[in-house]
Amino acid sequence: ADAINAKWGSVAAFKEALHTQDVDGFEIICKFDSDIILSKDYLQMIADSFAKNADYGLVGGLLYVEKNGEWVYEGNSNKKHVRGPMKAYRKECFLQIGGLRETLGWDNIDAILLQNLGWKEIVLPELQVKLIKVKGADYTIKPADYYGRYFYFLGLNRFLTYVAAAKEAMKIKSAFFLFEIISCYEKCKSLNLELKISKEEQKIINQHRWDLFKNKWFKM
């Protein structure tokens, strides 16, 4: 649970620091974790991409980890999603989505909401960000509890949660893993744990996930 809470603990630290600044004096708002290394031209290339593209709302590079002495792509997500450790927002976009949420799934909630408002989430593949991993850690492996809580706090309905849970269970070919995810999700619902998103935002997120599901399985 501590590891899961740490996922959005960086958001709390970011918001605490942001409150000390007058955002009116900035055009770009960045959230960077302390365990990453940026290239010397990273910030300039981010600024240039915003300046040249008025519809860019969120921009970032690709995350790399050291493996056997080489830096390789940390393939824990698709290459069109800006990962949590290295977010750069156009200020107007950041304010429109209401900032970041201190909850599991925050780094997907922001992307879905900004795209719904017409902004683009852009990954610049030429920008390599080095993640300093804890020795022996494998960030691609997550427990069932993580997924159950993640789907709940993302605001997903039961149908989409069960579909997503089945997808994760199939990856490791475990029916028990599916049962564990669903059990955790249902426990969160029964406890009526507080969500950091509004009812309207839940609808937006569910519609987004439903559209992805339809496009993949029905080609509609």
Describe each region flagged by the PLM.
Residues R83-G98:
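Conserved nucleotide-sugar donor-binding
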Residues C93-Q96, T103-V134:
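A short, conserved alpha-helix in the catalytic core of glycosyltransferases
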Residues I37-Y73:
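Conserved donor NDP-sugar-binding/catalytic core segment of glycosyltransferases
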Residues G25-I37:
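Short beta-strand-to-loop acidic/aromatic patch adjacent to the donor-nucleotide binding site
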